[in-house]
Amino acid sequence: MQISPIAPELIRLENIYVHRDERDILKNIDFSLHQNEIVTLIGPNGAGKSTLIKILLGIIFPNKGKVIAKKKLKMAYVPQKFNPSHSLPLRVCDLLDLEKCSATLREEIIQDTGISKLQTAKVQQLSGGERQRVLLARALLRQPDILVLDEPMQGLDIQSEAELYEYVRSLPERYGCAILMVSHDLQWVMQGTQRVVCLNKHICCSGLPESVQQHPEYLAIFGGQRVPYQHHHDHCAHGDHVEQCNHIDHPHIHPEPEA
């Protein structure tokens, strides 16, 4: 078995503690994310997943511990919910214009995410799936080192979910970004990620999906839910056989059918 070299580290958390109202939100968190890695964060409600993401994004600071990041680290975040005020009309093209990049990259990402026909639509009027694809496109236009996705499959139908799954797995190779995903979709977690981190205020277990599923703390939280693990990767996010469209030769997302 050939052992792949360890990719450069992008960010590391050391001995992180967060206290709020005399309660431990996070305790003794050691976590790192490497270039081109796909990591999924799972855990029950109240486990501290949102707090951990906020620390990584620099939105909040821990009460104790260190955050060590690569110089000029660029991060992009796709939130679980995005509800702009109806009093502030915002078209999709206006939202994308907030990110500066080449016209070629912009067109590529617009095509890949299936939002080319949504450019003049108001963000407030999009369906949940359309809005999710627009937010993903905007995040990719930022050309991040780390892309953070919070429940990206929510609001998608089965076909769109499968397409997004394949597309997300292609991103590290295509754009050179690491992916950190928060997800309750154990089917995706166990088949579409390289490393699973199970959080319940502390890191209960971490590693390959197959190993995590057998860990006692995972079993205690998820009640023995098991998903057949398929080894889709050679410690990178590519190499799968997927059915492609004739006009685009890489994973992408189809537009939603018109009503």
Curated annotation (Swiss-Prot):
By its UniProt entry, which PANTHER family does this protein fall under? METAL TRANSPORT SYSTEM ATP-BINDING PROTEIN TM_0124-RELATED (PTHR42734), ZINC IMPORT ATP-BINDING PROTEIN ZNUC (PTHR42734:SF9)
One GO cellular component assignment for this chain's record is: plasma membrane
Matching Gene3D superfamilies: P-loop containing nucleotide triphosphate hydrolases
Where located?
Cell inner membrane
Q: Which family does it belong to?
A: Belongs to the ABC transporter superfamily. Zinc importer (TC 3.A.1.15.5) family.
Biological function: Part of the ABC transporter complex ZnuABC involved in zinc import. Responsible for energy coupling to the transport system.
Record's SUPFAM superfamilies?
Answer: P-loop containing nucleoside triphosphate hydrolases
| InterPro entries reported for this sequence | AAA+_ATPase (IPR003593), ABC_transporter-like_ATP-bd (IPR003439), ABC_transporter-like_CS (IPR017871), Metal_Ion_Import_ABC (IPR050153), P-loop_NTPase (IPR027417)
Residue ranges constituting the ABC transporter domain according to the UniProt record: 11-225
Q: What is its EC number?
A: 7.2.2.20
**Which controlled-vocabulary keywords does the entry list?**
ATP-binding, Cell inner membrane, Cell membrane, Ion transport, Membrane, Nucleotide-binding, Translocase, Transport, Zinc, Zinc transport
Alphabetical GO biological process terms: response to zinc ion
Q: Does the keyword Ion transport apply?
A: yes
List the protein's name. Zinc import ATP-binding protein ZnuC
Q: Which reaction does it catalyse?
A: Zn(2+)(out) + ATP(in) + H2O(in) = Zn(2+)(in) + ADP(in) + phosphate(in) + H(+)(in)
Oligomeric form and interacting partners = The complex is composed of two ATP-binding proteins (ZnuC), two transmembrane proteins (ZnuB) and a solute-binding protein (ZnuA).
- Chief place where the protein resides: membrane
**Domain of life here?**
Bacteria
Tell me the GO molecular function terms. Answer: ABC-type zinc transporter activity; ATP binding; ATP hydrolysis activity
| Membrane-related topology note | Peripheral membrane protein
Q: Where does ATP bind?
A: G43, P44, N45, G46, A47, G48, K49, S50
